[in-house]
C-alpha cells in the first residue's frame, strides 16, 4: 500500500483555504434528514400545504393496506400495456382461469354494506382514486373506521387529508340518509391549489357514501362551519349520478385502479366513446378504438354491442373493460348492462350471456 506524501499540517493548511460553509439547520433537523435519506426506496409523501396540521376534520381519510397491494400486484401487472388494455393476452392455463374468476376491481351491489368508499390522491400525480375499504365487522361505523385507519400510518404513495379524531364527532342517520359532522376546530388558510385538491377528495368520497346529504355543526352545535377558503359550510347535497366515464390508472408501483373522468358527459354514448381514447393525463383507455359498435338503452337497462373485430376476451384487460363500462353505466343511472358480440360468454366471474347488474363502487381493498 502506497504511503501518502501529504502530512497532517499540509492537509490542515489546504482545508483552511476552503470557503466557509454554514449550516443553519438544528441538530434535530439534520438527524431527521439523514434518517429520511436512508429510505431511498420509499417515495416521500407530499402533503397538501402548510395548513394541513390543522386540516379539515370532516374528510374521512382511510389508509390503504400494503398487504393487499402485495397480493394484488401479480394480477395488476398483467394489465400493464403500452396502448389500450384490451390488447393484453389471455391466460389459458387452469391456474390462470381460476385466478380470473377471483379477480375484480369493483364491489358488487350485494356487498355494499361491507365497504366504505373514500378518495385518495396519488402523491406523484395528484390523481383522484376512489378506493372501497372493507369493514372489519358488519356493525362498524364511519367513526369506528376513522379510529382504526388512523393507527396504521400513511402510505407513501397516497395523499389523504389528516383527520384529528378528537376534533370531530360524526353521527350517522341511516333512516334520514344523513351524515352529521360536528367540527370542534374549524380549518382555515388553505391555498387555492390545496382547496382544489381538497374539494375533489371530499366530493369523490361523499359520492360513494350511503347518505344523500351531510350537515355541518360547530362546537357549540350551531349550524355551519367555516372550511378553508370555501366560506361557511352548512349542508351539502351528494349527487349520485355524475355522468362520467372510467379509465385505467396505474401508479408507479404497478397497481391498477379504475378512475372516473374529470368532466361529465351529456350522454352515456359520449362517455363510452371517450373511453376509447382518454384525453385525461396519466390514464389509459379501457376500450380499443372501434371496439363498441352500438350503445342503446331501454329504461334503466343499457345494451352494449361490440364489433366483430373487437378483442373482448377472458383476461385481466377484459375484466377491467367490462367493469369500467359497468361503472360508467352506473354514473348515468342504469341498473344493469347487457353485452353482445363478445368472443366468449365468460369474462372473469361474469356470465356475459346474461344481463349484469352495475356494481356498488370501484377498487375494493382490505385493511389488515
Swiss-Prot record:
Principal location: membrane
Keyword terms of this UniProt record: Cell membrane, Membrane, Repressor, Transcription, Transcription regulation
Cellular localization per UniProt: Cell membrane
Membrane topology according to the record: Peripheral membrane protein
Disruption-associated phenotype: Insertion mutations in this gene partially restore antibiotic resistance to the beta-lactam antibiotic cefuroxime (CEF) in a sigM deletion mutant.
GO CC annotation terms, alphabetical: plasma membrane
Domain of life: Bacteria
Positions of region (Disordered): 73-101
UniProt biased composition (Polar residues): 73-87
Function: The anti-sigma factor for extracytoplasmic function (ECF) sigma factor SigX, inhibits SigX activity and stabilizes it.
Protein name as annotated: Anti-sigma-X factor RsiX
Organism this protein belongs to: Bacillus subtilis (strain 168)
Amino acid at each position: 500500500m502506497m504511503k501518502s506524501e501529504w502530512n497532517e499540517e499540509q492537509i490542515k493548511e489546504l482545508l483552511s483555504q476552503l470557503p466557509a460553509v454554514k449550516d443553519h439547520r438544528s441538530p434535530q433537523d439534520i438527524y431527521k434528514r439523514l434518517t429520511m435519506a436512508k429510505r431511498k426506496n420509499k417515495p416521500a409523501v407530499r402533503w397538501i400545504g402548510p395548513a394541513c396540521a390543522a386540516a379539515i376534520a370532516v374528510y374521512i381519510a382511510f389508509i390503504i393496506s400494503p398487504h393487499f397491494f402485495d397480493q394484488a400486484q401479480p394480477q395488476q401487472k398483467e394489465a400493464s400495456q403500452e396502448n389500450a388494455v384490451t390488447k393484453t393476452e389471455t391466460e389459458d392455463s387452469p391456474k390462470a382461469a381460476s385466478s380470473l374468476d377471483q379477480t375484480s376491481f369493483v364491489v358488487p351491489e350485494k356487498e355494499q354494506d361491507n365497504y366504505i368508499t373514500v378518495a385518495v390522491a396519488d402523491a406523484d400525480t395528484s390523481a383522484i382514486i376512489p378506493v372501497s375499504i372493507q369493514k372489519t365487522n358488519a356493525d362498524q361505523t364511519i367513526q369506528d373506521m376513522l379510529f382504526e385507519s388512523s393507527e396504521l400510518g400513511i402510505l407513501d404513495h397516497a395523499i389523504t387529508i389528516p383527520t384529528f379524531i378528537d376534533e370531530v364527532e360524526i353521527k350517522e342517520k341511516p333512516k334520514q340518509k344523513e351524515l352529521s359532522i360536528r367540527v370542534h376546530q374549524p380549518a382555515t388558510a388553505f391555498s387555492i391549489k390545496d382547496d382544489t385538491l381538497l374539494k375533489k377528495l371530499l366530493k369523490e368520497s361523499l359520492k360513494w357514501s350511503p347518505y344523500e346529504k351531510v350537515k355541518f355543526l360547530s362546537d357549540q352545535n350551531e349550524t355551519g362551519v367555516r372550511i378553508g377558503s370555501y366560506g361557511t359550510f352548512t349542508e351539502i347535497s351528494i349527487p349520485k349520478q355524475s355522468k362520467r366515464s372510467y379509465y385505467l390508472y396505474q401508479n408507479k408501483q404497478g397497481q391498477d385502479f379504475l378512475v372516473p373522468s374529470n368532466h361529465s358527459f351529456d350522454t352515456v354514448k359520449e362517455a363510452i366513446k371517450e373511453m376509447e381514447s382518454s384525453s385525461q393525463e396519466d390514464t389509459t383507455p379501457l376500450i380499443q378504438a372501434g371496439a363498441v359498435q352500438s350503445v342503446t338503452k331501454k329504461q334503466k337497462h343499457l345494451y352494449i354491442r361490440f364489433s366483430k373485430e373487437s378483442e373482448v376476451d377472458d383476461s385481466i384487460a377484459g375484466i377491467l373493460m367490462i367493469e369500467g363500462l359497468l361503472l360508467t353505466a352506473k354514473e348515468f343511472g342504469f341498473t344493469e348492462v347487457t353485452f353482445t358480440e363478445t368472443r366468449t360468454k365468460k369474462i372473469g366471474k361474469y356470465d356475459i350471456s346474461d344481463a349484469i347488474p352495475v356494481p356498488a363502487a370501484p377498487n375494493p381493498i382490505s385493511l389488515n
